[in-house]
């Protein structure tokens, strides 16, 4: 089933010049980037985005970190993309993430774990709406899309 998900490369990924390398991983898996931008997240946007963690002891550090530098936000589209991206990203703690996952290969610690990926369809839609307007989406066909989404 074709889906959309929100994925964000955090300041540690952008500052370490990993954006292109990570983006390439998603594209090589057949995912389509339909919206993307580099931005500085405001404190208000950060608090809204991470609101579910507002009662956790790490919340203030998370807000400080995510607003400390640029992020690369994107909307990815593909077959069962939410589950696929979560597998590619790996465990929240890079020390527990499998080698070959983005966090396993590039993450430093739980606080600087390179990437955020939506964990459900509801989260994906909410996060996409927070960061993007419908006018920012590019709808296009990939050369192999007819094969990927061919009905059996």
Swiss-Prot record:
Enzyme class, UniProt record, top EC level: transferase
Signal peptide (residue range): none
SUPFAM superfamilies with a match to the protein in the record: Nucleoside diphosphate kinase, NDK
Keyword Cytoplasm: yes
Positions contributing to ATP binding: 10, 58, 86, 92, 103, 113
Cofactor(s) needed: Mg(2+)
Family, similarity comment: Belongs to the NDK family.
HAMAP family given in the database record: NDP_kinase
The protein, known as: Nucleoside diphosphate kinase
Organism of derivation: Methanosphaera stadtmanae (strain ATCC 43021 / DSM 3091 / JCM 11832 / MCB-3)
